[in-house]
């Protein structure tokens, strides 16, 4: 097979890592693959720069931009349709909302035999404006009518799409987002890193991994941390991430009286995130919008329980009372009590962590994801040939 994976930008992020591993799996299975993206610039850093001999072709075009730009997007559709037609791909696989809309339209215009799309997170939801929701829902309905298969990294988003009348039930297939789990499964606490971050040896650690940006949950995390700090004087809070709201969050911790208990580690490279998570006892994730939080999978791979909100795909990996606890969004008291319970009961903490580790080891290996996609491509192409 000859497959084109298309995403608007290859910054360091979950959807991008998924795309990279999907392409890598194709090449390792003996197929031909091109990864097509727009300019991969951002505070997060470029994933393309981290790729070492990926084994597949990579192409960037300035026409592919993340923001809605009608004139540029129209040019992108026609350019991409012409390119796909010339290259005679068997499959175009688009990722995320913007590339999904542009790529599916272009793929159908070009007559690509199989047009598929992966939902990593929805561009509409209860925390977005009515106008934005209507715009994206209509665009997603239009694009869904121009593709053969829609993959989702969580069942929750399939349900949300069908409720919004996007696509048909038979179009959807859940394929959990595979990851390179080995470094998380094997991670051990590093005393030198702990010392470098200024975390005393006898302190327990609550971790958070997310960009310092609204809706990533820090508006809830820090007030919750203040409650936990009062109950557990030896606890520190390790923040793994950076972003435009850092100064505001640092000020918030000062106002809450916990600035000396919070370590802002800054942007941690994907190659080292396992080392940092290994220093924690529990991970909190209070994002209001997340497809399926990769940080929850990564934390559980290290047997660290997770406390999170039951939004989007989170309950599919954070099983309440089994691999962590789910608490009502915005309920600081419930979140604090869940964290305190995990911190104060080491036997329960170990049990939650080990259950989660077993869960993600089975569901989230990247090779399992890749093999599932390839088998589905082949089955869909075979079914289309019979028609």
PLM feature segments, named:
Residues 107, 334, 341, 348-363, ...:
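A short, well-ordered alpha-helix in the C-terminal region of glycosyltransferases
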Residues 305-308, 318:
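Short hydrophobic beta-strand element within catalytic cores of glycosyltransferases
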């Amino acid at each position: 097979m000859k497959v084109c994976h298309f995403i608007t930008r290859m910054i360091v992020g979950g959807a991008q890592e998924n795309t990279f591993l999907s392409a890598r799996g194709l090449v390792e299975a003996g197929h031909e693959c091109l990864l097509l993206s727009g300019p991969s610039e951002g505070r997060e850093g470029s994933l393309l720069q981290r790729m070492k001999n990926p084994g597949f072709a990579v192409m960037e075009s300035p026409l592919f931009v993340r923001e809605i730009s009608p004139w540029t997007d129209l040019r992108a559709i026609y350019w991409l349709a012409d390119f796909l037609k010339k290259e005679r791909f068997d499959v175009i696989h688009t990722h995320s909302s913007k590339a999904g809309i542009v790529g599916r339209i272009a793929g159908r215009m070009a007559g690509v035999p199989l047009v598929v799309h992966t939902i990593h997170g929805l561009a509409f939801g209860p925390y977005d404006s009515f106008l934005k929701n209507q715009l994206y829902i209509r665009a997603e309905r239009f694009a869904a009518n121009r593709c053969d298969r829609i993959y989702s990294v969580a069942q929750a988003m399939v349900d949300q799409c069908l409720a919004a009348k996007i696509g048909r039930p038979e179009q959807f297939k859940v394929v959990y987002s595979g990851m390179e789990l080995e470094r998380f499964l094997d991670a051990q606490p590093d005393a030198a890193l702990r010392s470098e971050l200024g975390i005393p040896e006898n302190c327990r650690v609550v971790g958070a991994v997310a960009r310092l940006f609204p809706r990533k949950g820090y508006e809830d995390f820090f007030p919750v941390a203040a409650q936990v700090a009062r109950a557990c004087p030896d606890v520190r809070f390790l923040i793994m991430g950076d972003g435009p709201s850092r100064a505001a969050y640092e000020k918030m911790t000062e106002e809450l009286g916990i600035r000396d208990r919070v370590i802002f580690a800054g942007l941690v490279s994907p190659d080292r995130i396992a080392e940092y998570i290994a220093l924690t006892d529990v991970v909190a994730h209070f994002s209001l919008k997340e497809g399926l939080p990769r940080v929850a999978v990564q934390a559980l791979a290290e047997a660290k329980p997770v406390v999170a909100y039951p939004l989007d795909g989170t309950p599919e990996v954070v099983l309440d009372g089994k691999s962590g606890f789910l608490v009502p969004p915005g309920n600081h008291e419930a979140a604090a009590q869940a964290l305190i319970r995990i911190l104060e009961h080491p036997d329960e903490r170990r049990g939650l962590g080990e259950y989660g580790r077993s869960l993600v080891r089975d569901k989230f290996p990247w090779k399992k994801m890749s093999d599932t996609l390839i088998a589905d491509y082949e089955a869909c192409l075979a079914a289309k040939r019979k028609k």
